[in-house]
């Protein structure tokens, strides 16, 4: 109801709409809003209404929106913006780690046995969002510092050059010190000047727990 009221208000005010949705691989929200957009398009035929499944989450979706805003300021039309997002969404790399495996167990991401064993052995998973928009475990490292460094290592392997010119987003689950550590590593290793740090959003944070750390940047590919 809130989404419909927002979209309807924009359309009634004579605005066109480009909806960039949270990954359909992690939520049913995109499908619901896309259906709503189609219904409203029939009701407001004089307006342009587009929806794009970003296949992204958290700061990854935010960074994709940030890039879209820059393109809009450069003068791209709404159709060109839609096409740009569709063409570049799989260049948006998401690399995550978590500090408490029990949150992943409660969310069904790992088994209870794996969560307990990993906790005892101080194992930290490194995860990413794949081309279908799913959150996938990629590797395991021992110790928090190694998991933070692993995020930056992945950026070194895949970031689109010139890396120093990129805008990088970092989100964290109430662990600002770790976020600043990763930001410093990104600045030191790649010369990046524009690093934006923010809290992980509540929905993601509820599933991943305190200590969640995520790094987002533009990459040759997500893998």
Each language-model region and where it sits:
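Class I S-adenosyl-L-methionine
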Residues: 1-42
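A glycine-rich beta-strand to alpha-helix segment
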Residues: 21, 50-51
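Mixed-charge interfacial surface used for oligomerization/domain docking
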Residues: 26-29, 33-39, 44-50, 56-223
